[in-house]
UniProtKB/Swiss-Prot annotation:
Regulates leading edge dynamics and cell motility in fibroblasts. May be involved in cytokinesis and signal transduction. Residues 427-443 have a biased composition (Low complexity). Residues 414-443 are annotated as: Disordered. This is Coronin-1B. One of its GO terms (cellular component) is cytoplasm. Belongs to the WD repeat coronin family. WD repeats lie at residues 80-120, 130-170, 174-213, 217-260, 265-305. The keyword Cytoplasm applies. GO terms for molecular function: actin filament binding. PANTHER family: CORONIN, CORONIN-1B.
């Protein structure tokens, strides 16, 4: 008798999410209420940026990661736009540079002081003007320095050289309707887009040509999104004709049928996908949801494997994702999200439980670093390059929690009652007599300390034996499960 495979082996099967304590959240932030399906949040290893409500224009907060707790209403903002800010994105090659797109039809690039803002920042480093309607999408090139993509409600995609404020490419005939999102591939030679006409397009920006197109990737009328994966596949989220939320995986070489298609639920919030190329895990966050679902993408069918769901009580207004080089590798942290509530930002840590305190090579392969692989001029000339990788081993800090320290009192230094006059032995110095009198009590104290130490050691040995017994039991159960899956039992 054969059994259907119930459990797929995966090192990410036990990933769990944990919100941080309240004192590590960012409180009293007036998150933007603008109706736009943006993340409203961007984060890097130094700063957290959140689009906020602002009177008389658009603004966003930039906070050092360490500035947790209540944020004063008078805290300075980045406030140079004359209309609401719709999207923000940190430069992957400079942690102090951020770009913003706004309803005022402009893109602005800002230089944040190394230690954060001490006064409102109103003067951008660069203003990029080329759109005729509001700019809702900002995306830096992953490997070329100073190359920035913007897309607006004029259905135009512009690619800029920020260093010279020059418009490099204008793609104004490839999208007949509103663009929902864009995503670069790993080396920045192509990007994919999701459009209101229900099509997913793969575009070569330097040639200005359509490489591939899939009409009605999702048949529902609600917003959809598309992202490139590291292997060149395209992952999409959207809605079915019956308004059920869907996930799909596509091969750009053949967009006729999806490699995989899954239906999630019938909620109406747009699904925002966040992809980790190092682990091939996609985290899906629905706007207005109170959960984060995560899936592992593999090369074997069914390709999209559900892992787990993190659930909380409050719905999310937006979400930011920390780059891999900003995680705490010594705590086996594989992702960290910054969830926007109505009035605060709450970090959520995703962790893989591991027994060992050693650096986990399988969880942390070399990842994209902050160094650009190309200059803008090289990319324009036709060159492509993968991201320059760095090791996270240097960020690993060994845990010291397992060190057993026994603190022993110096019993000879204890204060003692004064001896009665004449109680010393005849001819013996008082200090000698005191030391002699202290010797029996000192021995008793040391014996008591030794007894406590022995109790601790016995308890430690008992715990080790229990852990070993449970480990053996788990191994037996896994073997039994394996035999059942293979039809041997």
């Amino acid at each position: 008798m054969s059994f259907r495979k119930v459990v797929r082996q995966s090192k990410f099967r036990h990933v769990f999410g944990q919100p941080v304590k309240n004192d590590q959240c960012y409180e009293d932030i007036r998150v933007s209420r603008v109706t736009w399906d943006s993340t409203f949040c961007a984060v890097n290893p130094k700063f957290l940026a959140v689009i906020v409500e602002a009177s008389g224009g658009g603004a966003f907060l930039v906070l050092p990661l360490s500035k947790t707790g209540r944020i004063d209403k008078a805290y300075p903002t980045v406030c140079g736009h004359t209309g609401p800010v719709l999207d923000i994105d940190w430069c992957p090659h400079n942690d102090e540079v951020i770009a913003s797109g706004s309803e005022d039809c402009t893109v602005m690039v800002w230089q944040i002081p190394e230690n954060g803002l001490t006064s409102p920042l109103t003067e951008p480093v660069v203003v990029l003007e080329g759109h005729t309607k509001r700019v809702g999408i900002i995306a830096w090139h992953p490997t070329a320095r100073n190359v920035l993509l913007s897309a607006g409600c004029d259905n135009v995609v512009l690619i800029w050289n920020v260093g010279t404020a020059e418009e490099l490419y204008r793609l104004d005939s490839l999208h007949p309707d509103l663009i929902y999102n864009v995503s670069w591939n790993r080396n920045g030679s192509l990007f994919c887009s999701a459009c209101k006409d229900k099509s997913v397009r793969i575009i070569d920006p330097r040639q200005g040509t359509l490489v591939a197109e899939r009409e009605k990737a999702h048949e529902g009328a609600r917003p959809m999104r598309a992202i490139f994966l590291a292997d060149g596949k395209v992952f999409t989220t959207g809605f079915s004709r019956m308004s059920e939320r869907q996930l799909a995986l596509w091969d750009p070489e053949n967009l006729e049928e999806p490699m995989a298609l899954q239906e999630l639920d019938s909620s109406n919030g747009a699904l925002l996908p966040f992809y980790d190329p190092d682990t091939s895990v996609v985290y899906v966050c629905g706007k207005g949801d109170s959960s984060i679902r995560y899936f592992e993408i593999t090369e074997e069918p069914p390709y999209i494997h559900f892992l787990n769901t993190f659930t909380s009580k409050e719905p999310q207004r937006g979400m930011g994702s920390m780059p891999k080089r900003g995680l705490e590798v010594s705590k086996c942290e594989i992702a960290r999200f910054y969830k926007l509530h109505e009035r605060k930002c709450e970090p959520i840590v995703m962790t893989v439980p591991r027994k060992s305190d050693l650096f986990q090579d399988d969880l942390y392969p070399d990842t994209a670093g902050p160094e650009a692989a190309l200059e803008a001029e090289e990319w324009v000339s036709g060159r492509d390059a993968d991201p320059i990788l760095i090791s996270l081993r240097e960020a690993y800090v060994p845990s010291k929690q397992r060190d057993l320290k026994i603190s022993r009192r110096n019993v000879l230094s204890d204060s003692r009652p004064a001896m009665a006059p004449g109680s010393s032995r005849l001819g013996a110095p008082a200090s000698t007599t005191a030391a002699a009198d202290a010797t029996p009590s000192g021995s008793l104290a040391r014996a008591g300390e030794a007894g406590k130490l022995e109790e601790v050691m016995q308890e430690l040995r008992a715990l080790r034996a229990l852990v070993k017994e449970q480990g053996e039991r788990i191994c037996r159960l896994e073997e039994q499960l394996g035999r059942m899956e293979n039809g041997d039992a």
